[in-house]
């Protein structure tokens, strides 16, 4: 495995794209064996100009225009532009460590039939809200068993962030589903595993990620995750992961419990007991992340945003895709 391609989808990332590209330039891997494809979705800020300036100085950095302005189309645009042995998916908000590529190559030797490897994300907080969100997303209570955020050991997993893929994976199972606004990476990894490949988490594969500091954007993001997960399930006629069901059940409990509580005092009592238990467990989980009571309470609030938004999106997705049998369309309200 010698040649490597890095694909970066982006749009309006003038604040971050330079840092991302600098981290790649500072990598110790032989640049003669590396190509970087930044797939820009017609940015309206200075992102394109920044990418062009880098590409003029470094022959291995290339700008591609993502005409459809969708993430999966951008990914496929970059992946199909290159025939390298290994292809890495990277985010514009990310920076990789100097030995990132070497450790990806090394990790492929740990198990037979590995199709993808990845590592641990280290959060970089730009403000207090970003730090709260980052803490919540580093908790198993917040995001389930997303090992690239919470994992403490190397081993097989069902998904990773900023994964490196063998070329043969794309040759066998195809590319990212361009119908999906969200969850295209989860859907792709599901197909990868279904076709006999494995995904490996190696903690020495390290990257930094600049966490967005907005509760409203977090809500929208996780609503979309839940909504589009239903479409993925319908398409493959299976529930791709068990952990996705829990926020959905939580939202059903909230709505159902409120209605039943209006009909019976016993149901109201039961509803309040279980609801109180949720907050107790949430606070205990938050207490492991910070000694500050104020920060703990904000993390608990973030837990609720994560669970409620994902669960509500999942519920609406079931209604749209299974009950109303809606077909896919590019809804602007659900795009990034």
Question: Where are the regions a protein language model picked out?
Answer:
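Short, acidic, metal-binding catalytic loop of nucleotide-sugar glycosyltransferases
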Residues: 23-33
